[in-house]
Amino acid sequence: MGITVLKNEGLDFHARISTPLSEIDDDIQKELLDLTKKVKIPGFRAGKVPVSIVKKKYGTSVRNDIIERRINHSVNHIIKEHNLNIIGRPKIEELQNESDKALEFTVKIELLPKITIPDLKKISLDRPKLEVNSKDVEEQLEKLAALTKNYTKESKAKIKDGDQVTIDAIGYIKEKTFEDGKLNDFKVIIGSNALIPGFEKQLIGSKTGSKVDVNVTFPENYHAKDLAGKDARFVVQIKAVHTAEPTVIDDEFAKKFQSNSLEELRTHFTKQIENESEEAINTIMKMNLFDKLEKLLDFDVPESLLEQEKNILKSGTDKNEQDESLLKDKSSKEITAYYNKLALRRVRIGLLLAEYAKSKNLQLEPDDLRKVIMQQARNFPGQENMIFDFYKNNPRAIEGLKGPALEDKAVQYIFNHEIKLKEKKYTKEELEKYLEAEEQRITLI
């Protein structure tokens, strides 16, 4: 076997490989002789079939198998001989495979870069810390109390905010009724914004037995596209008005929600408020870490990974209206530059984290995958069981989660053992503003 290295620079390794015709013919002859002992052909005893007959029947397929094995052997030999850290499948080009000539081909191999892990201990980040105060907890208690109000007291007074109103309604667009434009015995809490914006306010001041004309405009993003943005008039019959009995927030109230006391319920809400922001905090901290890493990394990346990531980004943008709107006023040159920069960032950071996980011998545990599946499920409220069933019944889909799961594990390890974290305290309102601003920023990266 002759090997001529054509290119060995950067992340590209190209070589021309030649195997003498005599070696190919010897391999074919040995394979045919073996087949004479195994094949069964009518008219011949087992093990006594002439080579010429076997060659006539199986010669082409045997030669193809030998060529494939020779190519694979040669490529594996080159990879081992030159200690190549490859990515993807080697490409075979310019194949010369005539039966009367030596086997020759060019192999093109893409390499993974040599990655030097930067000194992560020099990185410092702020870690947002939510300080839950009594006002935050009381607001949650009030919301819970509002959800559990008993509207048992019928009222003959004028409708006001907080009343429960039972209505019949018929909707008209340009004086014509429309599909799903009727309500019968519909109960609505005034001020709950359960109906089209502006609908409930126009019922205030009316009484049981009144007929009210309500004029509204369907929102542009209304789920029924044929109604979105259109003006409508509803003729509303007020059938009944009920006021809520006052809810006393005390230990007895808490016991309705599996808490032994009001103090225990308050503790539950404190933890719930903290947990609600934890995932968003972790996502933003991860992006802030990636911002720091991006400035430290300058190694070349495989072109195939770069193209693959750009295609993923473009596909994601096509499906995401928010991302699409970010690019709608950009020139094709600016859009290409955006995708190139973002793809390069993601591939570099992904390769670094994979190398870091390897250096720390980080291994995935079943719980790591469960966490990633839970994160996926949270993206589809009300369809969680469907997501769980999907991954339960699709092992290959779980394979696709292993990369992100290991990346998350590496990031958490870096947070816990490498970088300096400085706790920065926020009130609930301050944290919500901070998270909103950060979420808008990271849509660009």
Swiss-Prot record:
Predominant location: cytoplasm
Intrachain S-S bonds: none
Reactions catalysed according to its record: [protein]-peptidylproline (omega=180) = [protein]-peptidylproline (omega=0)
Matching InterPro entries: PPIase_dom_sf, PPIase_FKBP_dom, Trig_fac, Trigger_fac_C, Trigger_fac_C_sf, Trigger_fac_ribosome-bd_bac, Trigger_fac_ribosome-bd_sf, Trigger_fact/SurA_dom_sf
Gene3D superfamilies: 3.10.50.40, Trigger factor ribosome-binding domain (3.30.70.1050), Trigger factor, C-terminal domain (1.10.3120.10)
Signal peptide: none
Origin: domain of life: Bacteria
GO cellular component: cytoplasm
Gene Ontology molecular function: peptidyl-prolyl cis-trans isomerase activity; protein folding chaperone; ribosome binding
UniProt key word Cytoplasm: yes
Enzyme Commission identifier(s): 5.2.1.8
Domain comment (free text): Consists of 3 domains; the N-terminus binds the ribosome, the middle domain has PPIase activity, while the C-terminus has intrinsic chaperone activity on its own.
HAMAP family assigned to the protein according to its UniProt record, in alphabetical order: Trigger_factor_Tig (MF_00303)
Family that this chain belongs to: Belongs to the FKBP-type PPIase family. Tig subfamily.
Alphabetical list of PANTHER family matching this protein: TRIGGER FACTOR CHAPERONE AND PEPTIDYL-PROLYL CIS/TRANS ISOMERASE (PTHR30560), TRIGGER FACTOR-LIKE PROTEIN TIG, CHLOROPLASTIC (PTHR30560:SF3)
Protein name as annotated: Trigger factor
The species this protein was found in: Rickettsia rickettsii (strain Sheila Smith)
Gene name as annotated: tig
